[in-house]
């Protein structure tokens, strides 16, 4: 374990000041996300989604962001999966983007709601056929007998729906509506820059600096 304790990196690529950021956190996120794309980072759209059940027992996993606007952050999944069940019990969740090459993190907290059926239908229709069939074949988070059993279900639904599978009723989108968004920029000597946007309850956002 001593080797783990010795692992460290000094951060020095950038800085973050209230005078330089967008007053709207969605504008600031868009700025950073475009920079992550321009830097050709591998899958900059990956994020950690943390949920908790009714008892407060947490779980986390990597998912893909599929939409961002003033209404919130959108992702899609199986509603009957563990995360779907936890969100039904407890709609409060957190997202984390970590762009290590840029020494940046974005942490988002808020309440999750389902997207409209129309939004879910539109995104589902844009997916490759194999992924749409997979949404039917996978009983996500449930115990299965074997890989062969999963592939048999895939063949079954492929034969049933062909090239035009509809969206399963148990599959669709969620939108996290944020009430807090933190932007983190690594700095030397662990004196990192942390700016927190909080929703004031009206139409605006308040920006504060947090101690690292």
UniProtKB/Swiss-Prot annotation:
Pfam families registered for this protein in UniProt: PNP_phzG_C (PF10590), PNPOx_N (PF01243)
Gene Ontology MF terms: FMN binding; pyridoxamine phosphate oxidase activity
Enzyme class: oxidoreductase
Pathway entry: Cofactor metabolism; pyridoxal 5'-phosphate salvage; pyridoxal 5'-phosphate from pyridoxamine 5'-phosphate: step 1/1; Cofactor metabolism; pyridoxal 5'-phosphate salvage; pyridoxal 5'-phosphate from pyridoxine 5'-phosphate: step 1/1
Sites where the protein binds substrate: 8-11, 66, 123, 127, 131, 190-192
UniProtKB keywords: Flavoprotein, FMN, Oxidoreductase, Pyridoxine biosynthesis
GO biological process terms held by the UniProt record: pyridoxine biosynthetic process
Cofactor(s) essential for the protein: FMN
Record-linked InterPro entries: Pyridox_Oxase, Pyridox_Oxase_CS, Pyridox_Oxase_N, Pyridoxamine_oxidase_dimer_C, Split_barrel_FMN-bd
Cofactor: binding comment: Binds 1 FMN per subunit.
Enzyme Commission code: 1.4.3.5
Stored PANTHER family: PYRIDOXINE-5'-PHOSPHATE OXIDASE, PYRIDOXINE-5-PHOSPHATE OXIDASE
Biological role stated in the UniProt entry: Catalyzes the oxidation of either pyridoxine 5'-phosphate (PNP) or pyridoxamine 5'-phosphate (PMP) into pyridoxal 5'-phosphate (PLP).
Family recorded in the similarity comment: Belongs to the pyridoxamine 5'-phosphate oxidase family.
Protein name (Swiss-Prot/TrEMBL): Pyridoxine/pyridoxamine 5'-phosphate oxidase
Source taxonomy: Bacteria, Pseudomonadati, Pseudomonadota, Betaproteobacteria, Burkholderiales
Gene name of the encoded protein: pdxH
């Amino acid at each position: 374990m001593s080797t783990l304790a010795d692992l460290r990196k000094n951060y020095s690529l950038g800085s973050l000041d209230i005078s330089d950021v967008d007053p709207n956190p969605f504008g600031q996120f868009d700025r950073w996300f475009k920079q992550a794309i321009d830097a050709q980072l591998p899958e900059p759209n990956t994020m950690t989604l943390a949920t908790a059940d009714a008892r407060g027992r947490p779980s986390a996993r990597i998912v893909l962001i599929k939409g961002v606007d003033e209404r919130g952050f959108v992702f899609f999944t199986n509603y009957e999966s563990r995360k779907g069940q936890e969100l039904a019990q407890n709609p409060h969740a957190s997202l984390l983007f970590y762009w290590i090459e840029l020494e940046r993190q974005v942490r988002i907290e808020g309440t999750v709601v389902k997207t409209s059926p129309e939004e879910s239908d539109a995104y589902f229709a844009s997916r490759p056929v194999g992924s749409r069939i997979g949404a039917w074949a996978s009983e996500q988070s449930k115990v299965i007998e074997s890989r062969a059993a999963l592939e048999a279900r895939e063949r079954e639904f492929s034969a049933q729906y062909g090239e035009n599978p509809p969206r399963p009723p148990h599959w669709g989108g969620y939108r996290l509506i944020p009430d807090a968004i933190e932007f983190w920029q690594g700095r030397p000597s662990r004196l990192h820059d942390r700016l927190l946007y909080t929703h004031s309850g009206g139409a605006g956002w308040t920006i504060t600096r947090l101690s690292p």
